[in-house]
Each structure stands twice: as C-alpha cells, then as structure tokens.
C-alpha cells in the first residue's frame, strides 16, 4: 500500500510538472483574496476633533487588517458595561472596523471586553482586549495580544474620540507572520528581494511622506506658520525611512538676507501656501544638510533599497518673505547640486530611454554593488533640472499620476482617492496601467481649522486610521496605488514621537501589500505567492531572534515577560457580562476562554 501511495504521489507530481504548474509558478486557482462584502465603517465626526467633545465620546473602534491567505475566525467575545461590542471574522485580503461603545460617558475600572480570534488552518490565535484603568489620564485602552502567534502584546490608547486603534497582520503559517505591533528591519525591500525583483517599479507599493522635511519648525523665515498649521511630520527623515517610507515629498528653498538677495543663508525644507506668491505664509523645517546626513545614515545601515526624493519649490525666499521669490542663478544651482552630490548611493547614468516606473525593481536595487538607489527627482522652478552624471534627474523621467483630493474631511477624501486608483487596472497585458500612481491620503483643512485642531490631530484621528479599513477595503489584487502618502507617519498618539512610541501599521501594510495583495495577481507576480510556497524562507525567520514581549502604552518594553502575563485579560466574568451570542452571565464565573 505504501508503494502504491508513493506511485500516486509521483504521478501527481509528474502531472503538475507536465502542465507547467510547479510550486514556483503563479496559478490563478491558488487565489485566496476574499470578495465578500465587509460591514460599512464609520469616519470620525468632525466635532470630535474638539478635545472637549472628543473626551466625552463613548464610541471607539479596533480595526483588523488581514493580508494573509488565512481567514481570521472570531471564536467568541464577552463584554461588560458595553452597549456595543461588535466584532467579526476578517477574510483574506480584507479589513474589519470592529465597534465598541461604552455604556457610560465616564469610564469605570470595570469596563471590559475581549474578542478571541483563531487563524484558520493554523494553531495560531490572538486576542483583542478593551479595558479601563482608573485613575489614569488615558483610562480607555486597547490591548492587541498576539502572544499566541509568538508576536507579543501591545497596549494602545485611542488617539481621540470616535477613533480607531489598528492592527495589521501579514505573512502565512508557512512563511511566518508579521504584525504592526513593532517595526521590522529598516531594509524591508531588500528583505523581500526575491518577491519584488522582477516586478517593474509601477507594480510596487510603498509608503510616502507628505512635506517630508517638516518634522520641526525652525523659523528661518518670519511668518505665522506654526507647528499646528505648518508641521506635517513628527519624525525626521531617518526615522521616516525606518518606518518604511520610500517616497519623499521634499520642498526645498534657499533663504536670503532681507538686505542682500545675494547672501544665501542655506537650503531649508519649507512649507508655504505658495512659494511663488508675493507674500509667502508658512515656515521652514529641517535643513538640507540634516536631510542629507539622515539619508546617508540610513543607507549605510540598510543597503539595497529604492528611495525616491521628489524635490519641489527650488527657489529662494527672503527671511521676511514679502517680496516674491528669488529665482536661482547659476551659482545657487551649482551650490545646490554640490549639496546633492554628498548623498550616498545616488544612481548615475540611469537608462532614461525607459521610464523609471517601467524598470524592474532589481535594476535599481542591484545598483551600487547591491547598495540600491537614492533617486533624486527635481520638479521645481529651475532651467536644466537634471545631471545624470550626478544621479540627479528631471521628474519627467518617470510618468506619475499624483492625485490630491483637496478635501477638508476624511469622509470626502477617502472615496475620491479610492475611486482614483480603482479607475485603472494592474496587470493583464495591454490593460496594465503604465504610470506610477501616488495616492495623497491627506485632508486639506483651512487655516482656521488647522490652527485650532492642528495638522497632527487631523492626521492621527480621522485620516490615517481610515486607511486601514476604508483604504484597504478599496484595494484588491488588481487595484492599488504605488504610494500611500501620509502626514505624521508612524505617530499614533499626539506629540509622542520617540521611536518606542511609534506604531508600525504603515510599515506592515506596505510589506503585506507587496507580499500578499500584489502576489495574488498572476499578471503582477509571475512566481507563486511566496506565502503559499513550500519551504519558503520568510521575513520573520530572517529577522533572527523571535520576540514575544510586551509594549506598554507609555512605550516601556518588557522583552521577556512572565508567560502568564496578558495585559487587560479578565480572569473572572462578572454577572451582567454579555457573550457574543447574547447570553448574559447571571452569576460571576471564571473566564472560559483562558
């Protein structure tokens, strides 16, 4: 019998080989992406940005993004003193915004709820917990407990009223899992080289940062631009690179003495209402020297990446910017180009006969002896905007569709962006979209609103969280943008910009979109989805030492906790606790899910 089974296996293998269906070839029949309709989500109402109104909110969300070939199965829930505790399955390739509504406006120490998930086809499990802590300035918290996957636990505070905490998971049981509780290696592209090397750049998905150098206010011009209405990022270029960004919207100006236009006080990142206006309103951010230093630090530590810097403005302004722009003369241009030549891993003499978006990823990643490419694209007010011998190129070398919604509310911006990327198709021969698409996942509030509530709050409360349910559910293997450009990348809590306070949703989303979503499209990933291949070495394994620690809400990390410690876990279910099937506990009992 054993011999017969062996012969059957060999015959089956021979049939697969004869039909060309090896384990390394993409087969449309392997597709796991789910097309089922997800429950509608809810955007944060505008009035909740008011901290007084937001503080009185009783409704919050926990969003789960599934970029794996496995269904996330809800096994059960229980809640205490909650009017709504609505959790459900998360199918492959989809996201679910799970809703929580507390019974009372003021939290008590007894408010609690737990949702237990199993990853279908595996022995992996995770739990989502909502708990109140009294006394505390941030009493309502969420714990994402992935210790059952070997990925640790993290405690979060909601960024505002009617807002979400998000969890992104990618990978597979065969490949290994990765989640957004913490950042992975800085060189995420190099880590998936075998996955993306043969894909053209227009088939890659990457994070981008809007007004990337505006991570600080340096006041090199005299204007009313402030942190609230002019700063767009909380972390510098180096940390933006570490959080996964590979497309940088960088706006550079020279700053000149009021009494001497010929005296250049240096090149600075700038964010103003109009760089060509008679009166420019805004402020300066990082110096170009600091930006270059941060780029070089990152690339020395993380070789092999493709990094784009799209540089705009490229004019001068007086310290008091009320006399219009100063167009750069040859001396200023030479000085600027000299600065750019200090950037390491520029790619000289690239083939410009082919649009950069059509080159394979490996073309750039293999440059500089495998150290990758820092690609400088100039798009400002210059004549002669390139020097290929220096690795400096006109932005026209790349066909780009850069879509800005110009909407104040996330609820208006989101459908506009989704409709834009769904208007084109990825893969499919002649129908394959040939340009590089930038989705500006941004809102554009007016000056009054930004000054009152800040660009930071607009980013971390209504806008960025919506990407992980509305944005993800607007994508599928044939429809997605190349760049997801955001403000305040990595920032989950207001003004918490230290590395240990950042969260890795955008990083993990980028990894998962390339690893899972694009790989589900056989016209994009000609090789079999790496998450389904036998014997595939995953990113998780390549990271080395496994981690199953705990990150607390204040950023404190415990790398080797007691295995019985699970933040927010309810040991005894009190009478009045409601199970997911509607059963109400009449007498306190041990938690059956432990």
What is each of the regions a protein language model found here?
Residues 1-20:
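Fungal secretory targeting signals
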Residues 251, 309, 484:
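Conserved, mostly hydrophobic/aromatic
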Residues 343-478:
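Surface-exposed substrate-engagement region within the catalytic domains
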Residues 277-343:
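Catalytic cores of phosphodiester-bond-cleaving enzymes
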Residues 209, 253, 312-316, 379-381, ...:
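Active-site beta-loop-alpha junctions enriched in small/polar residues
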Residues 21-243, 256-301, 306, 443-535:
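Long, acidic (Asp/Glu-rich), low-complexity accessory segments flanking structured domains
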Residues 243-248, 302-308, 370-373, 433-434, ...:
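Loop/turn elements at helix/coil->beta-strand transitions in domains of secreted/extracellular proteins
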């Amino acid at each position: 019998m054993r011999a017969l089974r062996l012969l059957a296996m060999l015959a089956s293998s021979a049939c697969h080989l004869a039909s060309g269906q090896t384990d390394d070839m993409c087969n449309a029949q392997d597709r796991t992406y789910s097309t089922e309709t997800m429950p509608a989500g809810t955007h944060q109402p505008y009035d909740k940005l008011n901290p007084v109104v937001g503080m009185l909110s009783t409704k919050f969300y926990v969003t789960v993004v599934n970029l794996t070939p496995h269904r996330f199965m809800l096994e059960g829930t229980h809640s205490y003193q909650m009017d709504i505790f609505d959790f459900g399955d998360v199918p492959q390739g989809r996201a679910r915004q799970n809703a929580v509504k507390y019974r009372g406006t003021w939290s008590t120490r007894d408010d609690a709820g737990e949702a237990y998930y199993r990853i279908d086809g595996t022995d992996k499990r995770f739990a989502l917990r909502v708990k109140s802590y009294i006394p505390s300035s941030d009493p309502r918290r969420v714990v994402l407990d992935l210790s059952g996957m070997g990925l640790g636990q993290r405690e979060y505070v909601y960024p505002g009223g009617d807002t979400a905490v998000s969890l992104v998971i990618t990978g597979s049981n065969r490949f290994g899992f990765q989640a957004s509780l913490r950042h992975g290696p800085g060189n995420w592209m190099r880590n998936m080289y075998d996955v993306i090397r043969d894909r053209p750049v227009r088939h890659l998905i990457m994070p981008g940062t809007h007004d990337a150098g505006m991570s600080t206010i340096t006041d090199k011009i005299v204007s009313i631009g402030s942190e609230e209405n002019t700063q767009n990022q909380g972390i510098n270029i180096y940390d933006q690179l570490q959080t996964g960004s590979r497309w940088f919207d960088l706006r550079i100006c020279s700053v000149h003495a009021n009494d001497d236009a010929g005296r250049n006080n240096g090149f600075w990142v700038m964010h103003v209402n109009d760089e060509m206006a008679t009166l420019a309103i805004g402020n300066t951010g990082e110096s170009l020297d600091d930006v270059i230093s941060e780029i070089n630090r990152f690339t020395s530590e993380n070789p092999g990446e493709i990094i784009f810097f799209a540089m705009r403005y490229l004019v001068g302004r007086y310290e008091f910017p009320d006399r219009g722009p100063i167009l750069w003369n040859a001396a200023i241009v030479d000085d600027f180009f000299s600065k750019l030549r200090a950037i390491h891993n520029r790619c000289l003499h690239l083939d410009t006969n082919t649009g950069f978006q059509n080159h394979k990823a490996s073309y750039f990643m293999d440059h500089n002896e495998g150290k990758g490419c820092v690609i400088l694209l100039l798009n400002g007010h210059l004549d002669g905007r390139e020097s290929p011998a220096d690795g400096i190129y006109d932005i026209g070398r790349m066909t780009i569709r850069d879509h800005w919604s110009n909407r104040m509310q996330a609820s208006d911006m989101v459908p506009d962006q989704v409709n834009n990327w769904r208007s084109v198709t990825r893969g499919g021969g002649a129908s394959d979209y040939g340009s590089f698409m930038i989705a500006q996942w941004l809102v554009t509030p007016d000056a009054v609103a930004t000054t009152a509530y800040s660009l930071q709050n607009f980013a971390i409360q209504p806008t960025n969280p919506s990407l992980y349910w509305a944005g993800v559910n607007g994508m599928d293997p044939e429809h997605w943008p190349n760049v997801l450009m955001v403000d305040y990348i990595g920032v989950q809590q207001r003004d918490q910009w230290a590395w240990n306070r950042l969260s890795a949703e955008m990083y993990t989303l980028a990894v998962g979109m390339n690893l899972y979503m694009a790989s589900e499209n056989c016209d994009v990933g000609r090789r079999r989805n790496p998450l389904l291949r036998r014997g595939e070495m995953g990113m998780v394994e390549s990271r080395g030492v496994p981690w199953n620690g705990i990150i607390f809400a204040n950023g404190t990390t415990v790398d080797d906790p007691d295995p019985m410690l699970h933040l927010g876990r309810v040991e005894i279910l009190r009478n009045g606790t409601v199970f997911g099937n509607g059963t109400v506990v009449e007498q306190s009992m041990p938690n059956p899910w432990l």
